[in-house]
């Protein structure tokens, strides 16, 4: 139990695992999984560990997915990319722009690997992965059988996909297929992007604006450990939103296609005067209340305690109950984050 997980999670929480294996191809990943399973150990597959909170020591094998490679197919209507799951997401965004293939610029600086992007259906500034995802290639761990899921089969939702449900433990993502249409359409619906002129804006300007917003608001995990947005933006019924807006007319709200309304969790937390609040070694970030940061050798108990406090305060004031976006990992695998902080 002496393999530290601290370098493998951006929160910088210091727990150990029994074994840590880096897999650079599909066969190495399968071998590591099958070896650990034969020994009766639980197995966790990680990308860059940018969306996990280890609650305790992990009693099994952690496999770090480092399957690399980018292939491009140039078709008349779009560029098709086949990207290894272990590629860094932001480096991919930069690469596509440099190569004149826009479409990912709103998703700049999202931490983590390409293989993690469909699990969460990552999104930012009005764009989600499902907008550009063509397929996801997986391998069935027990058999080594390769499976390709179309974007529709991935059942993408808000920070959700089939990879959090039926496909969670039996399959590993080895590559993601992206489709970037040649008729580029800027998405300028959020934040500072609304100030850009849709008739003249370039993909590089959108990329630069997104990077500026993220770097000014969000802490660098290399300086202060964090897992990005700790809570999901809550999606509530139209009735709940109407009641809340009658009391708090300035609350940011984003009506969804299905009639529900997305609220800004950061705003709700901020209204409870929780920015900068600290418990043990963890604190609510002073610029972006949605982020919890490791100020000083935080322990996982500190994070759970502070997350519970934030959830209670927001729930009491707004009757809206926040759910973590971060995945909570116990001794033998993922546990319910909501139950842990309730």
Curated annotation (Swiss-Prot):
Enzyme Commission code: 1.3.1.98
GO cellular component: cytosol
Recorded GO MF terms: FAD binding; UDP-N-acetylmuramate dehydrogenase activity
Residues covered by the FAD-binding PCMH-type domain: 13-183
Cell location: Cytoplasm
Active site per UniProt: 159, 229, 325
Binding site for substrate: 190
InterPro entries: FAD-bd_PCMH, FAD-bd_PCMH-like_sf, FAD-bd_PCMH_sub1, FAD-bd_PCMH_sub2, MurB, MurB_C, MurB_C_sf, Oxid_FAD_bind_N
Principal place of residence: cytoplasm
Record keywords: Cell cycle, Cell division, Cell shape, Cell wall biogenesis/degradation, Cytoplasm, FAD, Flavoprotein, NADP, Oxidoreductase, Peptidoglycan synthesis
Domain of life: Bacteria
Pathway: Cell wall biogenesis; peptidoglycan biosynthesis
One record GO biological process: regulation of cell shape
Catalytic function, reaction form: UDP-N-acetyl-alpha-D-muramate + NADP(+) = UDP-N-acetyl-3-O-(1-carboxyvinyl)-alpha-D-glucosamine + NADPH + H(+)
Cofactors (names): FAD
Subunit note: Monomer.
Similarity comment: Belongs to the MurB family.
Entry function: Cell wall formation.
Name this polypeptide is given: UDP-N-acetylenolpyruvoylglucosamine reductase
UniProt lineage: Bacteria, Pseudomonadati, Pseudomonadota, Gammaproteobacteria, Enterobacterales
Gene for this chain: murB
